[in-house]
Amino acid sequence: LDVNKNFITTWRVNANDKIVLPFIVDQYFQGNYNCTIDWGDGSETEHVGGKNSIAKRPEHTYSQAGDYNISISGKCSYFVLSANAYSSTYPELLKKLIKIVSWGTVEAGGYGFGDAENLVEIAEPTKKTFIKCEDDSFAYLFAGCKNLEVIPSFLFRYVNENTTSFEGTFERCEKLTSVPEELFENAPNATNFEETFAYCKNLMTIPTNLFANNKQSNNFKKTFAGCTKLEKVSYELFDSTPNAINFDRAFY
């Protein structure tokens, strides 16, 4: 597996489980997939997409229980567990994703891992990769990943500089105890931090300079609401956010 080029995720399956990848397959997303999938169990690789829209989401059945690395190379623009059409159809699959091993370079445009409740590990990007969201938003990207314990310090190292929203990005990540100080430093135009860490009920500390480079931010509504184990908050936390006007229930 080429961890530099491939988008690699780990899934924990039982014998005869079927994994269906959360591709968006309707006509409005034609041309957004032209990739090869290695299912990680020694089976033949599968090519998906091209000029025409794919007819259905890629799927694969595993004969034996275990943890399998699914590797995607090529163009994979959308991988959205939280899309209603996927999450409502395959709710059991949200529990089977356990790691993001590598982001690769797959021309990603919009990804979402909301309610992947057993996701425990997120890779740190090594190149400009999935972080170039077309809608300039990371809203609810990892919301409900309740077993995620650590956020990589430079997860958003290569963020689109025009990114404006981190609304609910880590909402309900219940095992987080701390947040890296450098997390948002490369998003100088971010304005919306509503519910970013809301209901992270084991969060104990917030770095003083978390928003030091987010001078355009104006919305901190419920940013840390429900963070009942916070030990203290620095008086200087919002010193670099002169445009902030909404602190409604920021620490409620």
Q: Could you tell me what each predicted segment is?
A:
Residues 1-252:
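Solvent-exposed loop and capping/linker segments of extracellular ligand-binding repeat ectodomains
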